[in-house]
Amino acid sequence: MFMPDSIQLHLLQPGQRATITRINGASALRRRFIEMGIVKGETILIERNAPLGDPVEYFIKGYHLALRKEEAAQIDVILHEGANG
């Protein structure tokens, strides 16, 4: 189910903060996300892009992680108000 204000994580820019609303994709990928702490309701901060734009570094639950844009496209989020860096 698509939430009206939700967007895919890979569309956000460094400095933006969002709340995870849905995890899509194959069950193996969803399981991997859960193991990394990427779950519905968590806040995630977009830290920075790699020099060529992929992967992107995120900050969640007190640690940094990098996801490829194709992986981040499977995560729906709601952008926080005033979340531009």
What are these regions (language model features)?
Residues 1-13, 80-85:
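C-terminal regulatory/oligomerization modules of transcriptional regulators
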Residues 22-26:
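A structural micro-motif recognizing beta-strand termini
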Residues 9, 33-37:
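Short, surface-exposed secondary-structure edge patches
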Residues 5, 28-32:
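Short alpha-helix capping/helix-loop boundary micro-motifs
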Residues 53, 57-85:
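C-terminal structural segments of small proteins and small subunits
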